[in-house]
A protein has these predicted regions:
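Carbohydrate-binding/catalytic loop surfaces
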Residues: 42-61, 110-129, 180-192, 219-253, ...
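Low-complexity, Ser/Thr/Pro/Gly-enriched N-terminal "stalk/linker" regions
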Residues: 1-68, 93-113
Length: 641
């Protein structure tokens, strides 16, 4: 889907995109250039200048520091489509010139090894992220070419891709990435250029993984140095314990996993590979049905930033990395290429309205790496086992993978909204926009996620009959569909000429369309009480609240600085009040006032007297907005009466 043909015009996401283009991208540019006071030093641009011989100094930062620049450039490419900016484009061009100058004569591109350890190139695939950085720069190169028509970075990365292909593969040196990502980059290079060698190399890296589970241990034995001190025998950490066709459970580092799954699904759809798609489907089902938080977060433990056991989803120790949630959206969209099943669009929606945008402060200048479902100041971020659960968003990180990843996700949102084949236009998300598609131009007007009304105005480009398929969120028990004001019935209920059919989470309306035909979908936005599977021991006796796609959280600032002693009364949910915030940092959001009781006990540590129950009204805010009003308790899963 060409982003130039999609213009987001949505009250919710339009604001998010404006925040990213006007605030976040300039802020991150300053950080990458070490011009932003009070945040972690980046040095990422300076590393490229040093590698290019344009500056003197030493490498600084993580071994994968180059990827911060790549993801920022990719986000810039998308932002130039949303909001052309000649000055920003010139600065991006200048950075690309520096990157090109840092490339070595053999095509190799990596500032860490060029500056610091040139003699160690390609000796430590386990730890050193050379292929990972290459993959992100490939994605940036394709995005920038598609946005601007400029191919300088694309040519640089074609040189790096050629270098990689010459080195790794059958009858060459064996090798797999220690952190998957180059597979995604190679597939994007293939889609942009049509060069079959890129697709072939992506398949090699995917299918080589797990063939020799001892690969990284054997690699480590050949060298007398390490970088992080990773344990090469921890083969589940990087999913090298089995081939991609043998893996049935989502294990290991969650971002590594979903990046690999994304490339697998892309390759499966591109080559109509049913065996590979079946492998993707097994992993998808395990991950989303047994290892995903209600907010969409995946990877529940700080140990290895990884998946753990099925149903092991602690709230106050959750990891749920922002990058992992973004990666799940990448995976979902690739799965939709091959199977138009609403469960993939449901997952995208869950992530987009919850576990992704919770990673960014509402002012666009502070970011979460970790997205917990419960926070307790004094414990969270302070004591052993909880130090990763930072109760307030920092400005930047030494390992700053998430902020630029969030930028490229929000600015490329249009890529995830549509698909189109010979007979059907598919709408996956209720996002207001203007879309110029092959068969029709469609204007979507949406009040989502706060109100249940979406309209599609269709201007066909052909007199042929075709279908418009619109995803209906899986939580909806009922909805109404009209065409030009006339209510449509499902095909099983009517003999009318125009009707809708429902299949796998989508309604299909087949018609010979006319200018200004309007489909409208209306539905109630009820507060829903959600209960976890009883195998999720952390959530037994608790419930969460959801309205539309938005998961809600309770913060101390709204609830006498104590959410832990609250119990919500789900039997009185019909008394709940829905309020749209009129001012302040939460302006425009729908807040919930819920009947509840507060438990009040004595000062004794233990007592035979039960706590007193005091009736109160508890306020809940959208989960993604938590942490914007100072240091607070926060909780998603609440005890119930």
């Amino acid at each position: 889907m060409d982003l130039k043909n999609i213009k987001i015009e949505d009250p919710f996401w339009g604001h998010m995109q404006e925040l990213v283009t006007d605030v976040v991208i300039p802020f991150q540019e300053d950080v990458l250039n070490d011009r932003q006071p009070g945040v972690e030093k980046s040095h990422a641009i300076e590393n490229f200048k040093i590698a290019a011989g344009l500056s003197q100094g030493e490498f600084y930062g993580m071994v994968f520091q180059d990827s911060d620049v790549a993801k920022w450039l990719e986000g810039v490419a998308y932002s130039l489509i949303i909001k052309p900016d000649a000055a920003l484009e010139k600065r991006a061009d200048d950075i690309i010139d520096i990157i090109a100058a840092a490339q070595q004569p053999d095509g190799y591109l990596n500032t860490y090894f060029t500056i610091k350890e040139p003699e160690h190139r390609w000796q430590n695939l386990l730890e050193c992220h050379e292929l990972y950085c290459a993959g992100h720069m490939m994605e940036a190169a394709v995005a920038y070419y598609e946005a601007t028509g400029k191919d300088k970075l694309l040519k640089v990365m074609e040189g790096m891709a050629g270098h990689i292909i010459d080195r790794f593969g059958p009858d060459k040196l064996p090798g797999i990435p220690g952190h998957q990502e180059v597979e995604i980059g190679l597939m994007r290079m293939y889609h942009a250029t049509g060069n079959e060698a890129y697709k072939k190399q992506a398949r090699y890296f995917l299918e080589e993984r797990g063939k020799n589970p001892a690969f990284f241990a054997e690699e480590a034995a050949k060298r007398d140095w390490n970088h992080f001190g990773m344990v090469p025998k921890d083969i589940k950490y990087n999913q090298s314990h089995a081939t991609i066709y043998e893996q049935e459970e989502a294990v290991g580092h969650s971002v590594r996993a979903v990046y690999m799954y994304t490339a697998m699904a892309d390759l499966a759809a591109t080559e109509h590979d049913e065996k590979l798609f079946a492998a993707c489907e097994r992993l998808w089902n395990n991950m989303t049905e047994k290892k995903m938080y209600i907010t969409g977060g995946i990877g529940s433990t700080v140990e290895g930033e990884a998946f753990t056991k099925e149903y092991e989803l602690p709230n106050d120790m959750a990891y749920a990395e922002t990058c992992a949630s973004i990666g799940l959206v990448f995976f979902a969209k690739q799965m939709l290429k091959m199977s138009k099943n609403g469960k993939y669009a449901d997952a995208m929606e869950r992530e987009l309205y919850n576990g992704i945008i919770s990673g960014m402060q509402l002012d666009g200048k502070r970011f979460f790496y970790v997205n917990p479902l419960e926070v307790n100041p004094g414990v969270s971020g302070e004591i052993f086992g909880y130090k990763h659960v930072i109760p307030e968003r920092p400005g930047w990180y030494a390992c700053a993978c998430c902020p630029p990843n969030l930028v490229r996700m929000v600015t490329s949102l249009g890529r995830y909204a549509w698909d189109e084949d010979d007979d059907v236009i598919y709408s996956h998300l209720f996002i207001g926009q203007e879309a110029r598609l092959k068969k029709a131009d469609i204007k979507v007007v949406s009040e989502y996620p706060w109100k249940g009304h979406v309209s599609y105005s269709i201007t066909p480009k052909t007199g042929d009959e075709f279908a418009v398929a619109i995803h209906i969120p899986g939580y909806l028990k009922s909805f109404e569909v009209t065409l030009n004001g006339m209510r449509l019935k499902e095909n099983s209920e009517t003999k009318a000429d125009v009707f809708y059919s429902y299949r796998d989470g989508y309604i299909y309306i087949k018609n010979k369309w006319h200018d200004n035909d309007v489909i409208e979908i209306s539905f109630n936005m009820d507060i829903r009480v959600i209960y976890a599977n009883t195998k999720v021991r952390e959530d037994i006796g608790c419930a969460a609240l959801q309205r539309g796609p938005v998961v809600y959280a309770f913060e101390g600032v709204d609830n006498d600085d104590d959410v832990q002693s609250l119990m919500i009364d789900v039997s009185r949910l019909n008394e709940a009040q829905i309020e749209t915030e009129a001012e302040g940092i939460l302006k425009g959001a729908v807040l919930l006032d819920i009947p509840a009781v507060r438990l009040e006990g004595s000062d004794a540590l233990y007592s035979e007297k039960p706590p007193r129950q005091k009736s109160v009204i508890a306020r809940a805010i959208p989960y993604y907005m938590w942490g914007n009003r100072g240091l607070n308790q926060m909780r998603v899963w609440m005890h119930t009466i």
